[in-house]
Amino acid sequence: MLIPKRTKYRKQHRPDRHGMSKGGNEINFGDFAIQALAPAYVTNRQIEAARIAMTRYIKRGGKVWITIFPDRPLTKHPLGARMGSGKGTPEFWIANVHPGRVMFEIGGVSEDVAREALRRAIDKLPMKCRVIAREGGDI
């Protein structure tokens, strides 16, 4: 699981999901990537599920890069708790993803294998995404 080693504060405000991604919109490491088309909070468990889906499909060939990190805690009150009583306890860690952000990259495999591996990873993510190639266009 991806979580920060330590944070300055235990609880944070919920991040906004408005606007396009300001950085991380291009492929830096691999040949193919997953790009977000809608805003979402991606949890550490969803990132791990997508990573496992990709690596199981490509088996021993290729390399996977994760370019997002869940650095924000999301808090929740327990079920059945009444209103008030302060902010809830941190439940899980999220990465705030804006449209246009590249989240996963893959390299060292053929285009067909990369497309299928990334499609399986997209099924694990909570927002609409697309597969892009290093040349700049859709696959």
UniProtKB/Swiss-Prot annotation:
<dbReference type="InterPro" id="IPR016180">
    <property type="entry name" value="Ribosomal_uL16_dom"/>
</dbReference>
<dbReference type="InterPro" id="IPR020798">
    <property type="entry name" value="Ribosomal_uL16_CS"/>
</dbReference>
<dbReference type="InterPro" id="IPR047873">
    <property type="entry name" value="Ribosomal_uL16"/>
</dbReference>
<keyword id="KW-0694">RNA-binding</keyword>
<comment type="subunit">
    <text>Part of the 50S ribosomal subunit.</text>
</comment>
<dbReference type="GO" id="GO:0022625">
    <property type="term" value="C:cytosolic large ribosomal subunit"/>
</dbReference>
<keyword id="KW-0820">tRNA-binding</keyword>
<feature type="region of interest" description="Disordered">
    <location>
        <begin position="1"/>
        <end position="23"/>
    </location>
</feature>
<dbReference type="InterPro" id="IPR000114">
    <property type="entry name" value="Ribosomal_uL16_bact-type"/>
</dbReference>
<dbReference type="InterPro" id="IPR036920">
    <property type="entry name" value="Ribosomal_uL16_sf"/>
</dbReference>
<dbReference type="Pfam" id="PF00252">
    <property type="entry name" value="Ribosomal_L16"/>
</dbReference>
<protein>
    <recommendedName>
        <fullName>Large ribosomal subunit protein uL16</fullName>
    </recommendedName>
</protein>
<dbReference type="GO" id="GO:0003735">
    <property type="term" value="F:structural constituent of ribosome"/>
</dbReference>
<dbReference type="GO" id="GO:0000049">
    <property type="term" value="F:tRNA binding"/>
</dbReference>
<dbReference type="GO" id="GO:0019843">
    <property type="term" value="F:rRNA binding"/>
</dbReference>
<keyword id="KW-0699">rRNA-binding</keyword>
<comment type="function">
    <text>Binds 23S rRNA and is also seen to make contacts with the A and possibly P site tRNAs.</text>
</comment>
<dbReference type="GO" id="GO:0006412">
    <property type="term" value="P:translation"/>
</dbReference>
<feature type="compositionally biased region" description="Basic residues">
    <location>
        <begin position="1"/>
        <end position="16"/>
    </location>
</feature>
<comment type="similarity">
    <text>Belongs to the universal ribosomal protein uL16 family.</text>
</comment>
<keyword id="KW-0687">Ribonucleoprotein</keyword>
<keyword id="KW-0689">Ribosomal protein</keyword>
